[in-house]
Amino acid sequence: MYPVNLKLSIKFLFYFFLYFLLIIIIYGVYLYFKINQVIHGKIWKFPISIYSRIVTLEPGNNYSKKDIIAILKSNRYKQVNFLTMPGEFLVKRNSLILIRRSFNFPEGFEDKISIKLLFDKNKLVRIVHLSNNRNFSILRLDPQLIAMIYSPKGEKRLFVSQKNYPKALIQTLLTIEDKCFYNHYGINFYSMFRAFFVNLISGHSIQGGSTLTQQLVKNLFLTNIRSLWRKINEIYMALILDFQYSKEKILELYLNEVYLGQDKNEQIRGFALASLYYFGRPINELRLDECALLVGMVKGASLYNPWNNPVLTLNRRNLVLYVLFKHKVINRTLYEKLKSKPLNIQSRGNIIWFRSAFVQIVEKEFQKKVGYYFQNFSGIKIFTTLDLISQIAAENAIRHGIQQLKKKYKLQDLEASMVIIDRFSGEIRGVLGSSNPNLLGYNRAIQAKRSIGSLSKPITYLAALSQPEYFRLNTWIPDTPIKIKMQNGKLWKPQNNNFEFVGKVMLIDALKNSMNVPIVHLSMKLGLKKIVQTWIQLGLSSNHIFKYPSIALGSINLTSMEVAKIFQVISSGGNKANIISIRSVLSENNKLIYHSFPQSKQVISAQASYLTLYAMQSVVSSGTAKHLGKFFKNMHLAGKTGTTNNLVDSWFVGIDGRQVVIVWIGRDNNKTTKCYGSTGAMKIYHNYLKLNNPKPLLLIPPRDVYFLNINKSGDFMCFRSYSKYFRAIPVWIRNHNIFCT
């Protein structure tokens, strides 16, 4: 017989054990449902991903081999000697061969594909599918991720399924972090006890014993506060997670959840996004040494940051490679080869994460077209009109140009904005709202209304040339002193820049030399009503326009974007296009939410637009922008300089065969820039063209426009004898013989 006290003790322990077991079971059920709710629900809320434009190649289109190489490089394709994986291309004499990446386009998913692009006289003539030698009529190139915004909980990530991760990355990860991943049940007791004793002997934590499953539990379900209770929860939840889900599912979650760095105040989560962040390429295109770098960062992404601590990171990567060698994952030859490689990360400045000015425009358009704020969505993909080549060229042109001007004029507060749009479709190809491309806040491209100066002159000439029975390019305009009584009773006496008068000047020469007095005479003859009507036809709201004679000289305040809209119409034969930044929007599950279609409307006669644009070409060839014309002789560029009183604003509008570009330079305090349009804004445009090769602006005369010879006096000369004073000008007439009677 046992003593009574002993029986009671055994009974007490028995019931205590039962209650304890019951509590563990109940708590386990609670954890089970908690895990289940997260895993089977929406594990993550994703940020909004914004992509550059999707370039579509077609035989016969305007892309040269050089253009396509530039596009591929801007989309982070790698030029190689031998093709091995998607995202690579090689160059041959009259062809390009590439492996186009798989991508979920708005029109649907397209798998990776090997393509040969054939050129004749530097023009794309054939697109050949290499696997079956079939011709393609079109080829879409995958776009570049340019921004991720509205990151829930301050976490950025791109979800990639486990099957799309390279085997080299997974093998490296398991070798370094959890060799027994496929053999344990969520926890590895041997590793835990080993780490416990190592840390106990050293007196501080130097080794971890957590499995990938435990690390995942910590990231998904637990706080960062270290405690015994957290460790108990971690072990229990790891066992439940391992019991409930397959190893592949757990691995997939880990690959997309692990912390791998910081982008300002937002966390970089998952290997897929880290690959873009550090290397600028998708995860499936990384080499083994690059995979080793990312796996090495798992131990401490801040400590092993390749930008902040490159030497430490290199040593850590090489240690990972050494472990792979010791475990016979790689041989000595490969180990020696890989450890000698540099880190190969992209420079921090090349991370295209946030084009703030452009993203502001995208957000505004999204709200207008879709009817909701960005914050209401998770994981949507927005495909924009942004051309990376143009945008990066603009950023570099502004950055270097403003730096030179600041130094030259000793003005440290010079600011700038730049707008680039497609002259036909109206799609925005690039935007800068500041001299610092990545500066958040005030977007001068769409918020800063500034006096446009002489940029208004082409609109007055357009109004005149719309009346061919009264005005032609060879029409003489007075250049004599003029006094105009203003509404306040004061007399306005406009002057030319050189304070001289020549008596009279032909319309085309008045425009190309940006003369002030002739255009005032012209505007008085036209009437302010006609000029205002032309501005409104071009798309400007009547609220912007004050009916004063000085409107002819630019006493009108507009943003760079509003100026771009005006000159888009003139550059496209009088067709007003919708200025857009968004092509398509996909939902989180890749359903099409929104798609834009190019639309335009004829608002100005094609003939008057042609004549105005032709005159603007003379500005570049022999007028106020002739220095630009010297560098781009065969491009037939059109342009117009703009300068406001006291050199407060410096403007330039440049037009080539594909783009309208507006550049503004000024100071936020409205003090002088010391720059004319030709010495400030035009210099920026010049830099831009050097970085982004222009296309020739080849104008085709519309119906009823003919080229006729005129002499020095502006008279039409119908005989064919040669004279150095002859020049041909386009004339809008229905019967050209009328001038030769």
UniProtKB/Swiss-Prot annotation:
Q: Which residues lie on this side of the membrane: Extracellular?
A: 34-741
Q: In which pathway does it act?
A: Cell wall biogenesis; peptidoglycan biosynthesis
Determine if Manganese is one of this entry's keywords.
no
Reactions catalysed according to its record? [GlcNAc-(1->4)-Mur2Ac(oyl-L-Ala-gamma-D-Glu-L-Lys-D-Ala-D-Ala)](n)-di-trans,octa-cis-undecaprenyl diphosphate + beta-D-GlcNAc-(1->4)-Mur2Ac(oyl-L-Ala-gamma-D-Glu-L-Lys-D-Ala-D-Ala)-di-trans,octa-cis-undecaprenyl diphosphate = [GlcNAc-(1->4)-Mur2Ac(oyl-L-Ala-gamma-D-Glu-L-Lys-D-Ala-D-Ala)](n+1)-di-trans,octa-cis-undecaprenyl diphosphate + di-trans,octa-cis-undecaprenyl diphosphate + H(+); Preferential cleavage: (Ac)2-L-Lys-D-Ala-|-D-Ala. Also transpeptidation of peptidyl-alanyl moieties that are N-acyl substituents of D-alanine
GO terms (BP aspect):
cell wall organization; peptidoglycan biosynthetic process; proteolysis; regulation of cell shape; response to antibiotic
> Where is the stretch described as Transpeptidase?
395-687
Location(s), subcellular: Cell membrane
Which segments cross the bilayer? 13-33
Q: Which residues lie on this side of the membrane: Cytoplasmic?
A: 1-12
Instruction: Give one GO molecular function term.
Output: penicillin binding
Q: How does it sit in the membrane?
A: Single-pass type II membrane protein
EC number(s) stated in the UniProt entry for this protein: 2.4.99.28, 3.4.16.4
SUPFAM superfamilies noted in UniProt: beta-lactamase/transpeptidase-like, Lysozyme-like
Active-site residue list: E177 (proton donor), S454 (acyl-ester intermediate)
- Tell me where it mainly resides: membrane
Classify the source by domain of life: Bacteria
Gene Ontology cellular component terms for the protein in this record: outer membrane-bounded periplasmic space; peptidoglycan-based cell wall; plasma membrane
InterPro entries assigned to the protein according to its UniProt record, in alphabetical order = Beta-lactam/transpept-like (IPR012338), Glyco_trans_51 (IPR001264), Glycosyltr_51/Transpeptidase (IPR050396), Lysozyme-like_dom_sf (IPR023346), PBP_1b (IPR011813), PBP_transglycosylase (IPR036950), PCN-bd_Tpept (IPR001460), UB2H (IPR028166)
Please give the function described in this protein's UniProt entry.
Cell wall formation. Synthesis of cross-linked peptidoglycan from the lipid intermediates. The enzyme has a penicillin-insensitive transglycosylase N-terminal domain (formation of linear glycan strands) and a penicillin-sensitive transpeptidase C-terminal domain (cross-linking of the peptide subunits).
UniProt xrefs under PANTHER family: BINDING PROTEIN TRANSPEPTIDASE, PUTATIVE-RELATED, PENICILLIN-BINDING PROTEIN 1B
Identification of the protein by name? Penicillin-binding protein 1B
Species of the source: Buchnera aphidicola subsp. Baizongia pistaciae (strain Bp)
